[in-house]
Amino acid sequence: SLDKIKNTIKDFQSAKQFDDWLMAVGKSSGDNLRSICVEENHVRGCTTNVWIKGNKIKEKWYFGFYSNTMFTNGVVSIVCEGCNGLTANQVAQIKYTDFDWLGGNLTLNKKKGLQAMLNHIKNIAKTWLYSI
């Protein structure tokens, strides 16, 4: 859960410890979802290529992702984890500041990427919300 992740990060003593942990998260997540690497799933605003696809199951959203860099995979994994299992209205309520605990450890470019990932997820849910 996100609370467990927050508590893990809170205990880190250095930026290197955070980076190493995020790389490990990235390495262990993101099953090989190359099949989602199509234009409509591509996240604009990230310095590395990232694709996120949403699937709605019984009114709740679940997000899959693909990136070919471990660090980015770690970030997108955590962002998707924070949005998985939410309704479209709940996804719409998520703010960048909900991830301050993660963003505080990122460079400016990576923070922009985090915002772009979150915007992409929100747009997926919003598009569905306005289509009903």
Regions found by a protein language model. Give the residues of each.
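Structural motif
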Residues: 11-15, 66-71, 109
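Extended low-complexity intrinsically disordered regions
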Residues: 1-36
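Generic structural signal for hydrophobic core residues of well-folded globular domains
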Residues: 26, 82-83, 121, 125
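C-terminal binding/interaction regions
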Residues: 67, 89-94, 99-132
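Hydrophobic/aromatic-rich, well-ordered segments within soluble, folded domains that form packed cores
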Residues: 70-91
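Conserved interaction-surface patches within small, structured recognition/assembly domains
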Residues: 55-69, 80-83
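Structured beta-strand/loop patches that form or line metal/cofactor-binding pockets in enzymes
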Residues: 33-55, 64
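Mobile acidic interaction elements
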Residues: 2, 6, 57-64, 75
